[in-house]
């Protein structure tokens, strides 16, 4: 079909599979024949998507169920082959509306909270379902991920307040490979464009993921560039592009890898987080018992929580300082640039906790 793309090459994010299953279920409610290839509208400036669905069937009392199976494309992804169920039901409303409810295995913002989904996910559902609703009817849409609760235990969702399952937080249809070379090229192209902008003043904030991006905006830090896991190459490229002051802003469980000299932060390539934390704890004067406690923790967050507040603060500040030092050392291996690198770390509640001396001097001097 002209103007459409199939899900085979880049892979599609979880919200796309939810929207496709929801549309198939709605078509059943409308007494239309089952369509195993759903066309999804992304908006006027994007090509439509052709997304396969497995099945759809009516249920009792004005309900229907659609099922798709997630294909995130090549690469390692825990959502591969994940069954996506979506239950839909009519609701009486004066105007066509969608009522989104989290089903089993779908993340909530807190135990009694709302469904955790991105603006992109909501817009994709609204764009493809609302035009099909008859007058005087709304639609309840309940995504269900039968394996979502168990898979969520292998993610950092809980670190950011998402409970009970996987969050539907894709920000675009195609899967972005944070460890893939293509993703690095996109970041480098964006960096080059930023640096070439006449308004660019030589300051840049690098974040790894969406949580860092949101926090940077909340804190008024910028301009911001999301780099995924390619921290090392982007550091060098930033120096080459003329960046003078660079801030690394990230979750402590990610940036701690830089303190250990690991500058590609994808967990499939290298880990060593707790080992690095123990080494830093030794520097900070923790006792043998405290070091063993850190080594046996399930996560960096848990290790910090087990320490008393003064110890945690001292260790966190030391961590931020070492991230700065190791980043400067990494950069010096590739050239003699004068770019200054600061580091700031946030915790599982997305609270900015610690920053190093360079970050203090260049980015946080005027803060409370």
UniProtKB/Swiss-Prot annotation:
This is Cobalt-precorrin-5B C(1)-methyltransferase. InterPro entries: CbiD, CbiD_sf. It comes from the Bacteria. Pathway: Cofactor biosynthesis; adenosylcobalamin biosynthesis; cob(II)yrinate a,c-diamide from sirohydrochlorin (anaerobic route): step 6/10. GO terms for molecular function: cobalt-precorrin-5B C1-methyltransferase activity. Signal peptide: none annotated. Its EC number is 2.1.1.195. Keywords: Cobalamin biosynthesis, Methyltransferase, S-adenosyl-L-methionine, Transferase. It is an enzyme of class 2 (transferase). It catalyses: Co-precorrin-5B + S-adenosyl-L-methionine = Co-precorrin-6A + S-adenosyl-L-homocysteine. The keyword Methyltransferase applies. The gene is cbiD. GO terms for biological process: anaerobic cobalamin biosynthetic process; methylation. Belongs to the CbiD family. The keyword Ribonucleoprotein does not apply. It comes from Synechococcus sp. (strain CC9605).
